[in-house]
């Protein structure tokens, strides 16, 4: 935990408070926290330590006994929260467990997870694999995935959590004893493995089956309503009227949809402005306050500035 919190400090903007970092790590459900996480490349730490209490966080953050080598082990993902990483891996676990058991004609097993969205994803892909007789293709992709993880991370640990026919998974405590690593350090290394895994399976060409198991971060309930409204063709004013909220609330919902990957069509919201100059400026001056960007680029609204920042940090908007 010391190392994760220290890593968050190294990535955060100077003007951000300790409370802002605490909100990201514990997963505060606010649009400001979503934007803070995305704009500082800390999205994969969002909700990674939901049970952490503020006094303990302060104690960790003031600790200076940090090993630089340990910090180098920590990486972040710009497009997925910790829950998204974990749910996606749970889907891989469940599909592996299901295929392993059904190939041995065992249909009476306790699923690794009861998560509804995970089950939906796995059910869809399991049917596709079964109907197309793609079991060998799945095994080949899974093998390639873990070979790639090993090549990139040298030692990997999440393979201990795979479960199959008459093969139970290990607990973190057991892995800690086997590998002679503290459970805190193991948590950090597992997070590194999960992030590397997500970078890998985002490549649909390389992983045409496993790519289907990516689970996006969960939306807030009101943002979900906005998303359905957008899919039904409603505009800003109609969306605001539908939920009886101010237009800037809908702005926040739309930003959340971009931050969490539900919408990627930036031009639909930026087609009326020339935003490349701001992108160039932002990339060279990433740590400024929003009002400074607004003062320099007064023709842009705060929503547009935030949206461009989200696009840049997610790697979806480029100057060239």
For each feature predicted by the language model, list its residue ranges:
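Long, charge-rich, low-complexity intrinsically disordered regions
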Residues: 1-320
């Amino acid at each position: 935990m010391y190392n994760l919190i220290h890593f968050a400090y190294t990535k955060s903007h100077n003007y951000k408070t300790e409370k802002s970092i605490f909100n990201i790590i514990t997963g505060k459900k606010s649009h400001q926290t979503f934007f803070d996480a995305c704009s500082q490349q800390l999205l994969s730490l969002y909700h990674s330590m939901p049970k952490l209490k503020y006094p303990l966080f302060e104690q960790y953050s003031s600790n200076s006994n940090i090993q630089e080598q340990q910090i180098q082990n920590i990486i972040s993902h710009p497009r997925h929260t910790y829950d998204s990483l974990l749910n996606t891996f749970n889907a891989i676990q469940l599909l592996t467990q299901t295929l392993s058991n059904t190939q041995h004609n065992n249909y009476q097993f306790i699923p690794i997870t009861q998560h509804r969205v995970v089950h939906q994803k796995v059910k869809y892909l399991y049917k596709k694999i079964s109907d197309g007789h793609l079991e060998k293709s799945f095994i080949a992709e899974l093998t390639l995935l873990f070979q790639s993880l090993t090549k990139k991370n040298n030692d990997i640990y999440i393979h201990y959590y795979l479960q199959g026919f008459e093969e139970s998974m290990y607990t973190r405590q057991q892995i800690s004893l086997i590998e002679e690593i503290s459970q805190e350090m193991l948590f950090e290394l597992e997070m590194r493995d999960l992030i590397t895994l997500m970078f890998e399976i985002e490549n649909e060409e390389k992983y045409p089956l496993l790519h289907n198991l990516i689970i996006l971060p969960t939306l807030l309930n009101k943002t979900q309503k906005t998303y359905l409204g957008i899919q039904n063709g409603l505009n800003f004013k109609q969306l605001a009227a539908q939920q009886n909220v101010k237009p800037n609330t809908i702005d926040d919902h739309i930003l959340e949809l971009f931050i969490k990957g539900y919408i990627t069509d930036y031009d639909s919201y930026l087609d009326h402005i020339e935003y490349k100059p701001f992108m160039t400026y932002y990339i060279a001056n990433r740590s400024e306050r929003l009002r400074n960007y607004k003062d320099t680029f007064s023709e842009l609204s705060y929503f547009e500035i935030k949206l461009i920042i989200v696009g840049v940090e997610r790697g979806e908007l480029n100057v060239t």
